[in-house]
Amino acid sequence: VLSYNRLLDLGLLIRKYLRHCESIGMFARISDIKPKTVEELKNLRHLGFDGISIGTESGNDNTLAVMNKGYTANDIIEQCKKLEEANIRYNLVYLTGLAGKGKGERNAINTANVFNQLHPFTVNFVSLTVFSESELYEEIQRGSFVEATEHERLLELRTFISRLHIKTTLLGNTVSNTVPF
């Protein structure tokens, strides 16, 4: 996590050495935004910070808790509204399959309900990929987490899109998706 002061220093260096740079983008977590005030975010926006990609992954409190994300659906709303107030564009990432077998529809509905309260520039879809060195892989081996099938993930994505009622661009062009679009 980069502090406000560190981001400010980086922004000033970029402005000094890359004078024609129009936008400074980055990846962030909801918890990275939380310690920054709206005034600090406005200062960063003035330096060119814009187009932040946020790996929210879900807007379902149960899924967020089980995956130890460290924030709630309400936190997503609060922090993204701070970005909006600071006039910083942001992109949200939704991770299909994260809730596990049989839980995708509820996850999709709750996430769409959260995203419908926001104004993301884009919503990116990525499908869960479990790596052998992850804690989730260990949970799968123990039987405490069962992965959603590809069919379930497609149904989850369809449910999410059908419930999403905001003006945004939807992107699903990653190799992790069953049907990239």
Regions found by a protein language model. Name each.
Residues G51, N74-L136, H151-T174:
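Conserved C-terminal portion of the radical SAM core fold
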Residues T178-F181:
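Radical SAM enzyme core and accessory elements
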Residues G11-R19, L41-G48, K81-E85:
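Acidic (Asp/Glu)-rich catalytic clusters
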Residues L7, P35-N43, E105-N113:
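Short, acidic/polar
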Residues N62-K69, T96-G102, S144:
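Surface-exposed cleft-lining segments at the edges of enzyme active sites
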Residues Y137-S144:
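Short glycine/proline- and charge-enriched loop/turn segments
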Residues V1-Y4, L18-P35, F49-I76, F121-N124:
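Core AdoMet radical
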Residues S144-H151:
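A short acidic, glycine-rich active-site loop
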